[in-house]
């Protein structure tokens, strides 16, 4: 898996990087964190290799919810 954490945080925040094409924000109950990770990973793999943007995923765990914030950086805009 080429999604990897950049740095851990004592505030339960994880930062990930990867490549995708579209932006989205995913919210799910914390008990489906594994499923959510698979969904995010599948999205990344499915869109990989086609004019993709660099993105960062911020996982913020605030029981009982898991919020995933996705921030995209478009090469064309830079």
UniProtKB/Swiss-Prot annotation:
Q: What is the lineage of its organism?
A: Eukaryota, Fungi, Dikarya, Ascomycota, Saccharomycotina
Q: How does it sit in the membrane?
A: Multi-pass membrane protein
Q: What is this protein called?
A: Putative uncharacterized protein YCR081C-A
Top-rank lineage group of the source organism: Eukaryota
What is the organism field in this record? Answer: Saccharomyces cerevisiae (strain ATCC 204508 / S288c) (Baker's yeast)
Gene Ontology terms, cellular component aspect?
membrane
Q: Does the keyword Membrane apply?
A: yes
> What's the further remark here?
Completely overlaps SRB8.
Q: Which UniProt keywords apply?
A: Membrane, Transmembrane, Transmembrane helix
Q: Where in the cell is it found?
A: Membrane
Give the residue spans that cross the bilayer.
25-45, 50-70
């Amino acid at each position: 898996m080429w999604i990897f954490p950049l740095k851990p945080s004592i505030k339960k925040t994880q930062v990930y990087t990867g490549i995708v094409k579209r932006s989205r924000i995913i919210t799910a109950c914390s008990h489906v964190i594994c499923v959510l990770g698979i969904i995010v990973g599948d999205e990344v793999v499915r869109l990989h290799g086609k004019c993709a943007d660099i993105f960062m995923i911020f996982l913020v765990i605030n029981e009982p919810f898991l919020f995933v914030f996705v921030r995209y950086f478009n090469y064309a805009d830079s």
